[in-house]
């Protein structure tokens, strides 16, 4: 996942963190449009809304230990490292005890994979692991043209996107909706 943007963004959403909270904006320098007090009051309000005590089950995996270290550091810098469990793990070891959940993945493809002959087997393994999580959904970004074929299932939705290269796809493999929780 190249530094774990998906798990980090999920943790930030779970903790009610405003996107871009640690960066500056050109609009801050436009006091004639947005007064400084209004700007800083909004920033203070956004900080007060953060809840790092939220319980999460967000996990990030990569087979490359260096990428896991980078992901942990990125999560620490974003302030959500306590909300994510990172682990060195290959897709062949993907399993989870929960009945419902979802996978967000951007597996290697094309230039990101040293040996392109490994792609069919990688995507078959993704499909096998996903089938075992039969109540889960999977959201997959790839430029690999044979993804659906090798996964062994046609995506419920397929969108073309641009991920620094043409013909990148966002596949949505939808599982059943979990039952609604009842307030106790």
Q: Where do the model's predicted regions map?
A:
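C-terminal catalytic and target-recognition region of SAM-dependent MTase-like enzymes
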Residues: 90-93, 97-184
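Conserved S-adenosyl-L-methionine
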Residues: 1-95, 111-112, 118
């Amino acid at each position: 996942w190249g530094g774990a943007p998906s798990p980090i963004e999920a943790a930030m959403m779970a903790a009610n963190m405003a996107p871009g909270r640690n960066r500056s904006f050109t609009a801050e320098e436009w006091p004639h449009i947005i007064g400084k007090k209004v700007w800083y009051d909004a920033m203070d309000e956004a900080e007060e809304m953060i809840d790092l005590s939220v319980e999460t089950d967000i996990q990030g995996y990569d087979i490359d230990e260096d990428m896991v270290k980078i992901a942990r550091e990125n999560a620490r810098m974003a302030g959500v490292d306590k909300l994510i469990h990172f682990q060195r793990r290959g897709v062949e070891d993907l399993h989870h005890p929960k009945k419902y959940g979802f996978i967000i993945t951007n597996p290697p493809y094309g230039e990101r994979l040293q040996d392109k002959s490994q792609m069919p087997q990688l995507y078959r393994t993704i499909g096998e692991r996903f089938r075992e999580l039969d109540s889960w959904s999977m959201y997959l970004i790839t430029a690999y043209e044979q993804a659906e074929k090798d996964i062994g299932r046609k995506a419920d939705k397929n969108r073309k996107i641009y991920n620094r290269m043409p013909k990148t796809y966002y596949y949505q493999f939808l599982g059943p909706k979990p039952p609604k929780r009842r307030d106790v």
